Amino acid sequence: MRPKDAASILLLDRSTDRTRVLVGKRSSAHVFMPDVYVFPGGRRDADDRTLPFARDLSPAVLDKLMRASSRQMTQTSARALALAALRELHEETGLRFGADPDRPDLSPLRFVARAITPPGRVRRFDTRFFCCFTDEAGIDPNEIRDSDELQNLEWLDIQNNSSLNMAPITRMVLEDVTKFMIGDPSLQSESPVRQYFERRGNFIRGFL
């Protein structure tokens, strides 16, 4: 089974003393990863390629997205992943990105990780994880709302989350992004990109 392209977003709130990230619990009705906490996200749809935007991703992010693919990827396809992440963010949490949500500014988005579901699972995804701070996107953290897709939404302290039943890949991505922020609190667009995949039965936690 070939993995489906997907996108997810780590939305970070730095308005308090402790940086927080938005997570929610997947519905028990989901076939793939039910009842675990994850970041907002989902599959890239064909329509995501034609969604409007105000400003593009940074050249560094576009370049890394096109390199982080099992097959040749165009700028349009790479951009569609970012637009898919923002579409899913709105659908699952009610949050709108930027001053003009119908034409989002993609330039604040960083590309921080890529995870490929191992073979043999009921669903397989090739997920690219984006990251952004709420103040950069004009987002009020208090405006989140649950949805059928993502419930029990909460802002989680990025350094104090061991008690939450998070999907293993979600926890790994959060751990690595938290480590990146120690040396680079603003997460520049040139920051490293983690990759998680399985090769010949061995789990690989490497870099792009």
Name these PLM-found stretches:
Residues 1-22, 27-58:
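Conserved N-terminal beta-strand and adjoining loop/helix that marks the start
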Residues 4, 16, 31-32, 76-78, ...:
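A generic fold-level signal
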Residues 5-8, 94-102, 121-125, 142:
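A generic short-segment signal for beta-strand/edge and adjacent turn/coil regions
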Residues 6-7, 79-87, 168-175:
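A structural signal for well-ordered alpha-helical segments within the folded catalytic domains
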Residues 14, 44, 94, 135, ...:
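Residue-level marker of positions within ordered structural domains that often coincide
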Residues 22-23, 86, 97, 101, ...:
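A structural signal for short, well-ordered beta-strand segments and their strand-loop junctions
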Residues 39-41, 47-106, 130:
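The catalytic Nudix box helix
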Residues 63-70, 106-208:
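Nudix hydrolase/Nudix homology domain
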